Amino acid sequence: MSTPSFVDAFSQQFTLDPARTALLIIDMQNATGNRHMGLGQLLAEQGNSDSAQYRFDRIEQLLIPNIQKLIEGFRTAGASIIWITYGANARDASDAPPHIAPIIKATNNIAGQPEHEVVDALKPGPDDLVLNKTTQGAFRSTALDSALRA
C-alpha cells in the first residue's frame, strides 16, 4: 500500500454550484501590481526597485497566470466574477482613512487614474462586477456583502 502524497492527503473533492459561487479578484491594480506604475514607480524613484523585484516577479509569473486560469474556468461555468479594487474615489484621498491616504496619494491610486485600473493582463469582463474599497476591508466599504447574497 502506497502512502498518499502530502497534497493528496489534504485534498478533498468538492463541487461548486456556479449559481452560488463567485470568484473574488482583489487589488490586482497598476498601483500595486505593476512594476512600472504606482508602487513600482515610487520604489524606482527612491532607488529601491530591487527590493520589490521578487514581489513583481511573483505577480507576473505566478499570480496573474493563475488568476487567468480561474477567470477562464469561472466564465466557462457561468459563475460570477467580482473585482475588488482599492483606492480613493476623491482626488485628495479624503475618503480614505488617514493612515492609508499617504500611500494612496504616493502611488496615485485614485479612481479614474491609470494606476487605479486593473493590470492589463487581467481586465474585468462586461458582466463582471467591480467594487472599489476605500479601506482595507472589502466588506466595510463596498456592497460586497449584498452582491454575494444576491
What is each stretch, according to the model?
Residues 1-124:
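Active-site acidic carboxylates
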